[in-house]
Amino acid sequence: MENSRTPTNKTKITLNRTPTLKERRWNTLKVNTSNVRCSTPIFGNFRSPNLSPIENMGTKGKSPVSPMRFATFKKVPTKVHPKQQQQQQHQHCHRTQLKPPPFVLPKPQEEIIEPEREIKSCSSPDTCSDDSNMETSLALESRRRSIKASNHSYVVNHAANVEQILMHMGLENYVTNFEEAHIDLVELASLERADLVKIGLNTDEDCNRIMDVLHTL
């Protein structure tokens, strides 16, 4: 203990420490305000990380990021000939007077098809008369069959097929003739004697028997 003592030589010890505000040299960085656009202002000595170009908002009258002066982009007025000016005014008036076309509802498909059928059928007077006669005869025939079928609506609605009606009325011997002719319930209710001859029932006895049964339905 007697031999130990405090050293008398003074030594300077340097330690790492946080730099003060005065030593922050990176805060004095300048940015070209004409090429950088940013809206973050500067408050005191604190600068935003993105190096905002807005500086001294209170002292400067205009913002450095304000748009460029319009005077540099003003178009030089050119002299217009009176005739050319009148023509431009006429074109402008003509465009303003244009109105959209009136909206027309499309016609139904049936109204379009019917005139086409009439034109095709009446291309010549002979064919027109023949077609009209055929159409009237078909219309009359379909109307006659529908009227007769309506009178037998109960049978038509409650029977499964033609065979069932013939078996029920005792006409099972004629089932084959009706099936080969592909006669359905509506046609069965509106059959006439001439129709029976067409399906192969030529004898008067068969025709009379079938017609009597159909009339009693």
UniProtKB/Swiss-Prot annotation:
Subunit structure: Interacts with polo. Interacts with cort.
Post-translational modifications reported in the UniProt record: Probably ubiquitinated: degraded during the oocyte-to-embryo transition by the anaphase promoting complex/cyclosome (APC/C) containing cort protein.
Alphabetized GO MF terms: DNA binding
Result for mutant: L21A: Decreased degradation during the oocyte-to-embryo transition
Protein's UniProt keywords contain Metal-binding: no
Protein's name according to its UniProt entry: Protein matrimony
Keywords: Cell cycle, Chromosome, DNA-binding, Meiosis, Nucleus, Phosphoprotein, Ubl conjugation
Modified residues (Phosphoserine): S63, S66
Keyword DNA-binding: yes
Location(s), subcellular: Nucleus; Chromosome
SAM domain sequence ranges: 157-217
Organism: Drosophila melanogaster (Fruit fly)
UniProt note: phenotype after gene disruption: Mutants exhibit a strong dominant effect on achiasmate segregation, inducing both X and fourth chromosome non-disjunction in females. Precocious nuclear envelope breakdown in oocytes, due to defects in meiotic arrest in G2.
PROSITE patterns, A to Z: SAM_DOMAIN
Highest taxon, organism lineage: Eukaryota
UniProt xrefs under SUPFAM superfamilies: SAM/Pointed domain
Chain ranges for the short sequence motif POLO box domain (PBD)-binding as given in the UniProt record: 39-41
GO biological process, alphabetically ordered: distributive segregation; female meiosis chromosome segregation; homologous chromosome segregation; regulation of meiotic cell cycle
Described purpose of this protein according to its UniProt entry: Polo kinase inhibitor required to maintain G2 arrest in the meiotic cell cycle in females. Holds heterochromatically paired homologs together from the end of pachytene until metaphase I. Haploinsufficient locus for homologous achiasmate segregation and may be required for the maintenance of heterochromatic pairings.
Disordered, as annotated region: 83-106
SMART domains in alphabetical order: SAM
S-S bonds: none
